[in-house]
């Protein structure tokens, strides 16, 4: 099972398609590979809960039953929006990627300027992960940042034990200035020397 919902939100120029490398590029025709795709990310249809699967034809009957008994079908207006999105993919995706690339280029350098904060420049997606020295409990830190700095970040532990100690910052903002304001709030909070 390969979750490739962020495939189109890729910022490196090392593929001919501009998309992230796919497991489909490596799979043999008889592999039991199922690739999950979504309209939520690259088409900004978050919350509409519409996507698609790429899978061997032999799996279609069983997966069809699973879908029928769990979700039934997507509303017609959502399906029509998806048709337009697919028809306009060459116009939509580059604009979305350019905007997210700009937001990432705003957020990541500002975070790197904060003492005690480490982050990396994500090659894709719409999130930056950061670590704050001296704050190993990501849930406790996320709660404190909401209460004390007015800054809502996701705790790394929500994404599995490997992400404990990290925070996830969504940089999919309409206004990159809001990202700068968020970093200012984090910087002010850190400068106040708030102990854990």
Please identify what each model-predicted range represents:
Residues 1-196:
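PLP-dependent class I/II
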